[in-house]
Amino acid sequence: MSILDMKFWSLIGLKKKPKARWSKYYSKKEMNIDVPNISIYQFLKNKSIEGNFKDNTALEYFGTKISFTEFFRSIDKCARAFRSQGVRKGDVVTILSANTPEAIISFYALNKIGAVANMVHPLSAENEIKEALQRYSTAMLVAMDITYSKIKNILDETEVYKTIIISARDSMPLFMKIGYEVTQGYKVEKPKKYNKDYMYWNDFIKQGENYTKDKVAEITKRDTPAVILHSGGTTGTPKGIVLSNGNFNAATIQAQTVMNMVTREDSVLAIMPIFHGFGLSVSINDVLSFGAKVVLIPTFKASEFDKLLTKHKPSILVGVPTLFEALTTNERMKDVNLSNIKYVVSGGDTLSKARITKINEFLHNHGANANLLQGYGMTEAVAAVCLDQPVASRPGTIGIPFPSNYIKIVKPGTDEEVGIDEDGELCICGPTVMLGYYNNEKETNEALHIHKDGNVWLHSGDIASMDKDGYITYKQRLKRMIVTSGYNVYPSQIEEVIEKHEAVVDCSVIGVPHPYKVEVAKAYIALKAGYKDTPKLREELTELCKKNLAAYSIPKEFEFRKSLPKTMIGKVDFRKLQQENAEARAEERYGKK
């Protein structure tokens, strides 16, 4: 069944406007944004024409600068190339790539022809990639060459009829291409040049140069599916979040309202990955809509942060708490001048008021006239849905909702709103809320609810409170989920993998504090009789995880016990393990009471 035939919720427009305590911070026009009935591609193209920034640099990649004119020309060529290979409106094409020009050009080209981009982490395990290709009936695959060693084993089990191979070197300057090939590229296993199942990027683009069989651009409406991003939800069972053209365009209009000081002279370090809503929407689409420059960083190394800031002098920093921890702990940042920084936005996880103060002091001591603004969002609502305000900042909060977004705090499991400053479940209503989960009506109906006001509300599963002015304070996750460096890690998924080992009888995974990643996974394991904790067993468990899990999901600690604590109904009591772990760490830090 085509994605265009699936049943989705229609979310543009409200039955009745919810109350908004924060409305005084916006104008009446800002509170009622108009989402155009066009594609993401067309919206960005219109912005480039209106703003007349055709000669501005759109993308920079290892010194290669691509102007907006060149960018749109490349998108057009790529769109024709996809058409020449049989891709049509509603087809799903998977992009398995880091932040490269080719991946971004592919995203907009697919959107131009009405196809749907399925964004997948290139470091996903072989089985995860196979499941992503199978589940979404992927017609074509755009994959980095570093993934070939995994995809070559699985493509025969999918519907993929052609794979386009891209490389980190494709858009590098010539001297850097040579250096890359000599130092790294030669190590990467690649398909043969003339393999019918594979095509290299330049050959692919040439296929579309003379394509004139039919029109390339499709008339695409705002409620048409545009992109699939991924979340494991509370259980770790992979779910495809289907976002529409209207979702993305609404998010961009909101960003232009809230971050209205951004101009075509600005630039951002695109460190957040494009397979993440935060990266694709905020760091790429939103920034390009301002006519500003996106500096693509395919692989981020915290130890080289100072070099990136010194070389590129970005005016916008967007990232997860891990990024800003790296900023303040890098010893080589001592003499780096940050006076060019205008906006610093953190999302993906929360920062305490003390940590925000520390980061702000660091920024000010290095010449920046900006404070860190903390936001909150969900991939199910594209990315950020609220943000602390530059002119009315309240550190420690996640700010107020973006214009035309509505947030209310309800008693969990109901649509009954709680009082001012009371804790409850955070619910979201507005034009960025997803169409639904791909081919998963049950999960969709659990996440999206029609409340008494007749509007569709997204239940976040997160606990928060709201003050009298509409500022929201995030408290904790209802979900049993670990966030490591901004990535969602699902304990149940890890447990399922570990319990496949013949020696394991019980397993429970919790998140434990980490100085840079915020949290990492720790696995508690009970072994069957006759098995012992040995280096060989630990190695086998690690290899099992590597084969079946993304790198960021692999536990950093294993602890073996004779048995694991149980609840009254016989389930492993992970909360007890969390408590024990917290007490042990406190004891290490402060000594026994």
Question: Predicted regions span which residues?
Answer:
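AMP-binding/adenylate-forming catalytic core of the ANL superfamily
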Residues: 124, 131, 141-143, 317, ...
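Gly/Ser/Thr-rich phosphate-binding loop
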Residues: 314-319, 328-395, 406
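Conserved beta-loop-beta connector loops within the AMP-binding
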Residues: 408-427, 450, 466-469, 532-538, ...
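Conserved AMP-binding/adenylation subdomain of ANL enzymes
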Residues: 249-267, 275-316, 330
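Conserved structural elements of the adenylate-forming
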Residues: 72-77, 205-211, 222, 241-261, ...
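Conserved AMP-binding/adenylate-forming core of the ANL superfamily
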Residues: 35-36, 55-86, 92-100, 104-108, ...
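AMP-binding/adenylate-forming catalytic domain of the ANL superfamily
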Residues: 166, 547-572, 590-593
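Conserved pre-ATP/AMP-binding loop-to-beta segment of ANL
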Residues: 189-230, 237, 260-267
